[in-house]
Amino acid sequence: RSGPAELSHILKDSGAQAWVGAAPDTQYPEVPQLPVLPVRLHARDWHHVPEPSPRRTAFVLYTSGTTGAPKGVLLSRGAIAAGIDALAEAWDWTDRDTLVHGLPLFHVHGLVLGLLGPLRVGSRLIHTGTPTPEAYARARGTLYFGVPTVWSRIVQDEESARALSGARLLVSGSAPLPVPVFEKLRELTGLTPIERYGMS
C-alpha cells in the first residue's frame, strides 16, 4: 500500500484524472483530490467499442525497489498479451487450470499475470485475499503464484506446504527466491518452483 508521498507522486506523474471505482478509503491532504467515476458492477455492457491498437498503452505501472521516486513504465496492450501468451504456452496454462494467489493487484505479478492472465487464458482464479499458508493449502489449485516472502512462510508451515503437492506449478517472482526456501519447497511439495521476472 503506497504512503501519501508515493501516492501523490504517482498520481501527479501519471497525469491521473479520476478514480475509477471507489475512492481510496484513506484521504491524505497532500494527495490530489480527483473526481470519482463509480463502476456499476451489475450493469451490462451495451456499448460497442472498437478494439484498440496493440500499440496503445494499457497500463502505467510504477516500479518498486528503485532509488528515488517510483518510475512510470508504459505497458502496451500487445506487450501484455504477448507476455501472457508466452507464459501460457511455456507453462501449458489452460482453461482447465485453477490459479491461486493472494498477491496485491497493483504490481505486474498480481495484476497482469494473476488477474489478466486467467481472464485471457480462461482459467479459474482464486484470490486468497491474504497469501497465508492456510489459504493457499485450502484452495486446491493447479498453479500457485507467490513472492519469496509468501513461499518462506509456506515452507515454515509444513502441513500447508505438503497440501500444495497436488498442484502442477509453483511460480515465484518479483525477487529472487532464496536457495534454502527453493530447496525446502521442492522437498515438501515434490515440485520444482519456477522463478520469473516482471515486465516493469
Show where each model-derived region lies.
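Short beta-strand->loop structural element characteristic of the AMP-binding/adenylate-forming
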Residues: 1-18, 71-74, 101, 123-130, ...
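Structural core segment of the AMP-binding/adenylate-forming
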Residues: 1-50
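Alpha-helix/helix-capping structural signal
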Residues: 24, 78, 149-152, 175-176
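Conserved pre-ATP/AMP-binding loop-to-beta segment of ANL
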Residues: 44-62, 69, 92-98
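Conserved S/T- and glycine-rich ATP-binding loop of Class I adenylate-forming
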Residues: 57, 63-66, 99, 105, ...
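Conserved AMP-binding A3 loop
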Residues: 58-85
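Conserved AMP-binding/adenylation subdomain of ANL enzymes
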Residues: 81-98, 106-142, 157-158
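Gly/Ser/Thr-rich phosphate-binding loop
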Residues: 141-146, 155-200
